[in-house]
Amino acid sequence: MKFKYILGLLSAAAMSVALAGAASAQDKTVKIGAIYPLSGNAASAGVHGKAAIETAIDIINNAHPELGNLPLAKNAGLAGLGGAKIEAIFADNQGSPAVGQNQALRLITEEKVVALNGAYQSGITLTTSAISEKYGIPYVAGESVAASLTERGFKWFFRVTPIASDFAKIYLDFLKDMKAGGQKIDNIALVHENTEYGTSVANVITGMFKDNGLSIALDISYSANTTDVQSQVLQLKDKKPDVVIMISYTSDAILYAKTMQALDYKPPLMMADNAGFSDPSLIKTVGKLVQGVFNRSSFSIGPPGSPTFLINEMYKKRSGDDLDDTAARMMQGFFVLCDAIDRAGSTAPDKIQAALKATDLKPDQLIMGYKGVKFDDKGQNILASGLVIQLQDGENYVPVWPKDKAKTAPVLPYKGW
């Protein structure tokens, strides 16, 4: 009987060791949920985002000392977790807030991810991050800009990108500079899709411009899934605004470009709020129809041999395109999350949360042109910043404002085609 008892203890000990070994082996891979539109109207942005995150994983999991001070590039894997590798579990939100919410739930409860990343469209980031908040799982958004996302009192949500108010201030200052140079900006039209992204950004721009003496003469709201924007373009043609600001995703931005050409409408100055106008598929499809459009950005590819140049080469092998601002912000958000996991030295949610709160990255540790990454109590990066770019050379955006970051001067009036 005593022998059987000892044998039982030994068997139990062996089982514990085996389970511990299995857990240790499992810890060699850290799973992060990445929720993006891999199908639907915004699929191009999601597919490019997937390529950006896969590039980031390559950089993290393999040693890339040539990338300078970029965190996690020097060594293979997460040093804080004994060289553990990162694995992204991609989930297609299909451009739907409800689908995105279900995917977030699945990733947390079934895939057992330690954190979430995504989800491009602000309206989907809104629903997916609500699930992570409920379950106490860290969520990092690298690209969603709706101001409301960091106004919910959430404790598990962190955003790396500048927000709508940051970009609205950039637009305001840029237009004032253009006015000082003789450009008329008295009447401004906002054209925006009607989800959380378009509506919230339009509201922020309207409020800021009004407070600074600029008039929004025309506000045009439309469905991002629309197949006909003739009436909206005819409104613009009739009202003749001095400035048109487009807040659009990819398919609707392409539709507007084609319709403007068909109806022979060109505003004197046209600006875009990133999103669809930064998508490489738009540039390939209708880039020749929107020459001279201004856009906002926080990213530019550096000279040969620089970290951003080398990263772009890696990304281009996966995607076939150069790294655009949106995909770069997605990549930056993923880097920030992985850096926090590494510093946490743990996959425990509260440890990752604490590491995110303590984040203090410097400009030379980033691929974006931010002043750094440091989160306030709401989870917003207070060091995020941006600039104005213009499509001047076929398919290439170039920085044009502010002057200290410009590679060339702005060209006016808007050329179109």
Spans of model-derived segments:
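Extracytosolic ligand-binding ectodomains
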Residues: 2-13, 25-417
